[in-house]
Amino acid sequence: IHGTPGEDGRLQGYFDMMRIPYSCCGVLAAAITYDKFTCNQYLKAFGVRIAESLLLRQGQSISDEEVVEKIGLPCFIKPSLGGSSFGVTKVKTKEQIQPAIVKAFGEAQEVLVEAFMDGTELTCGCYKTKEKTVIFPPTEVVTHNEFFDYDAKYNGQVDEITPARISDELTKLSLIHISEPTRHSL
């Protein structure tokens, strides 16, 4: 179930209260990862490199100059809650900032203004049983679009390459740096 209540921890909480087993992450992991700002702050505590960002709350404003000064261009402006890249804009010029903020506030009451980080996009899944934790090899995400937007995610505008085309050393580092701290804490 996409969005609320399936991805934000509510459904898991209901199942926990009724003692119904389920096969996805628990309440805490879902709640933290559904909120991009909270998730970023949480991961920073484990030394994970996170893009510089600003959080705007409904009714709060920011000037174009302040965005450029504090975050730089290009940047991403997106709702802090939610998924599927709804309300996300890759902003390249000052003139795009305010319309992108309005668009993001159309999806949520908090908006994240986040610096663009250039590089190879990776994702890495894992699951835990009573006996062990299994970590999958990193997958490289190569979008055909400007960024990994809704169209790329749901309409086949992406290549997902497993294992990722990165060095063995970088593969080991990514597994340690990303999967280890987060899997034990979430």
Report residues per predicted region.
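Phosphate-binding site of ATP-dependent enzymes
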Residues: 92-170
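Hydrophobic alpha-helix-in-membranes signature
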Residues: 20, 73, 78, 136-137
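Short glycine-/acidic-enriched loop or helix-start segments at secondary-structure transitions
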Residues: 7-11, 86-87, 123
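Short, contiguous strand/loop micro-motifs
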Residues: 25-27, 87, 168-169
